[in-house]
Amino acid sequence: HNGAAALSDVTRRGGVAYTYSPWMRDYESGYSLHSLGSFYKINQRNAILLGLRYFGYPEMDGTGEGASGIHPKEIAVEAGYAYEVIKNFSVSATFKYLFSDMGRIGNSRGASSVAFDLGVLYKCEINDWEGAGWSVGLHVSNLGPKINYLTSKDALPATVKVGGAADLPFLQMHKLTLTADLGYRLS
C-alpha cells in the first residue's frame, strides 16, 4: 500500500535511491531489474517524484531461445505528485511512459504506452504508545490504454491493492513493523 502517497510522511527534503535485482537467478541468468528513483518535498504537504526502471532479459536468438545478439528490454519512466490533503491523509498520482522492446524478434518492433497510478494513504498514531502508529492504503496501478505491438494490442496488468501496517517501537532505536497487503489484478 506504500505508493507515492507515503511521501507525505517523509521528513527529509529529498532523496535518491538505486536498486539492482538479479531476476530469476535459479531459472536462467541474464534477467535483471534496475530501478532509480528520487523525490523532492516542495513543502510540508507537497512532493514530486521521478523514477526510471529498466528490466533486461538474457540475450536471445530470433526464436526467443539461446543467444544470438537480440537483447529484449522493458523501460518505465515515471513522474508523480503526492499531496497531504489533511493531517494524516494523503493522495498521489503517478504518470508512467512504458516502452517494451522484444529485441526485434520476428517482424516486431518496440511498443509503447502510458499508464497512471493512483493512491491514498491514511495514517494514525496509537495513543499512549510513543512512536507507535498504524496506516492503511489503497493503490491502483497501470490504468491506461493497451500497449501496441506490431501485430497485437496487450492490456497492461492493471491492479488494485489494499494494505495496512503497524509500527510498534520496542526499544529506543528499534521498532517492529507488521504489514499485510491484498492485491487483485483487474486486467
Which role does the model predict for each range below?
Residues H1-S187:
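Subset of outer-membrane beta-barrel
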